Amino acid sequence: MSSEKQPFYEENGRMYHAYRKGVYMLPCDEQEQDRLDIFHKLFTVARVSDGLMYAPHPRNGRFLDLGCGTGIWAIDVANKYPDAFVVGVDLAPIQPSNHPKNCEFYAPFDFESPWAMGEDSWDLIHLQMMFGNGQTGQRLPAMASPPHDSYYSQSLASSRSRNNSDAMDIYAITDRDPPAREPSGYSQWYRNGSPSVNSIHSKSSEKQPFYEENGRMYHAYRKGVYMLPCDEQEQDRLDIFHKLFTVARVSDGLMYAPHPRNGRFLDLGCGTGIWAIDVANKYPDAFVVGVDLAPIQPSNHPKNCEFYAPFDFESPWAMGEDSWDLIHLQMGCGSVMGWPNLYRRIFAHLRPGAWFEQVEIDFEPRCDDRPLEGLAIRQWYQYLKQATQDAMRPINHNSRDTIRDLQEAGFTDIDHQMVGLPLNPWHQDEHERKVARWYNLAVSESIESLSMAPFSRIFNWDLDRIRRISSEVKSEAFNKEIHAYNILHIYQARKPAN
């Protein structure tokens, strides 16, 4: 993800990045990139043992590289740990495009601006050569200056500790338990997918599971990963969308993908659990599991249905590879950082020949009989798109990218359906009008929920401004003279039988 504007400019014969011009005082041309890679090589040689990091870390963990430069450290870590997920961020978009599949880069990204990357969610955060480039000492108090006076008089082990190197590995910026001590009730799964006796229960956070922000309740597990609330108002909104999807589908309202009636179904980001409960009621011989970051699922669910929360499906799973007959994901855009990595994980957990189904809404407003430029609904979507991109969990949806990522993950027989979602019942067709009535209700309940955290956290908007644009969007959504619509995308993809 790079800047849409010209990303570089020339000064004194050298090239500098143009994003937040002047923040970083070093160039970013090819000569500078060579210099950064030379320093990376120096650090790997200067370290006594592991040339990449000293801090304890899991081999399948989540690694974040701040100010990644050319991305060389992130790429080396991704190649060393193929089961890990590595993200590099930088002001300048100078990272290669041919990086490992378990590695992602986001630029331009200013890590001295507010983040929305998920608190309590990273196993290791790495920062290298940042002194002199902003107020990182104030932002990251773990960055202590090395004791220069007695450097060579110390023992070798001490002089090479991570506290005495500018190549810093920040293991725990936030107050979090080491990975081995995190909630483990949902990770007690055998490889064949059969849950252990101790894991058959709904798992919730041992810490306070929710916190309040701008008058709405959000889940506290890995705070900030998911930018939508989880209070009763939000739960009603999710259930309305579930109803909308069942109405918008032509035939089976729950899923299109082939599936056995007595199969094993996994619902990722299950929300209130309504889809999982409906499937469990429809197929009493099936076994249905729903996982979510927020423990908001009901306790009175069917006996053949289980919920596990908090559960971050972008972190490593232990739920039985090759064991699920269908994996379902609904409205994941805006909450996922690395789609290719997630698709590979889904692929690994499906039985050979089993199916994955994904349902997404493309919120970009469309209209066939008039331009929407200048309308609040168009401006709102552009703001939402930018805010979620800055948070590295974009809400905008691209079907070509989705199909490509599914193919690269190994899926075959990919089917893609598109359904129009009118914002109000302006259409003459009765089925379209029924869909529109449900979608109008869903949108009216969604504008403020979708806007609150992205606009306040990323743009620092106050509540009055957020509510004002939300009200304008709702007014246009109710206006039958504006024939706007969104697109519902439904994908089915099969894991090959062989």
UniProtKB/Swiss-Prot annotation:
Catalysed transformations (reactions): L-methionyl-[protein] + S-adenosyl-L-methionine = S-methyl-L-methionyl-[protein] + S-adenosyl-L-homocysteine
InterPro entries: SAM-dependent_MTases_sf
Catalytic activity, EC: 2.1.1.-
Domain of life: Eukaryota
Disulfide bonds: none
GO cellular component entries: nucleus
Compartments reported by the entry: Nucleus
Any one GO MF annotation of this record: methyltransferase activity
Pfam families on file: Methyltransf_23
Induction text: Expression is negatively regulated by hstD.
Class of the enzyme per the UniProt entry, highest EC level: transferase
Keyword Nucleus found: yes
Key words of the record: Methyltransferase, Nucleus, S-adenosyl-L-methionine, Sporulation, Transcription, Transcription regulation, Transferase
Main location: nucleus
Keyword match RNA-binding: no
Deleted gene: phenotype: Impairs kojik acid production.
Gene Ontology biological process terms from the UniProt entry: methylation; sporulation resulting in formation of a cellular spore
Subunit structure, as described in the record: Component of the heterotrimeric velvet complex composed of laeA, veA and velB; VeA acting as a bridging protein between laeA and velB.
Sequence similarity: Belongs to the methyltransferase superfamily. LaeA methyltransferase family.
Role of this protein: Methyltransferase that performs automethylation. No other methyl-accepting substrate has been identified yet. Component of the velvet transcription factor complex that acts as a global regulator for secondary metabolite gene expression. Controls the expression of the kojic acid gene cluster, producing a secondary metabolite used as a skin-lightening agent, an antioxidant, and an antibiotic.
Name the record gives this protein: Secondary metabolism regulator laeA
Protein's gene: laeA
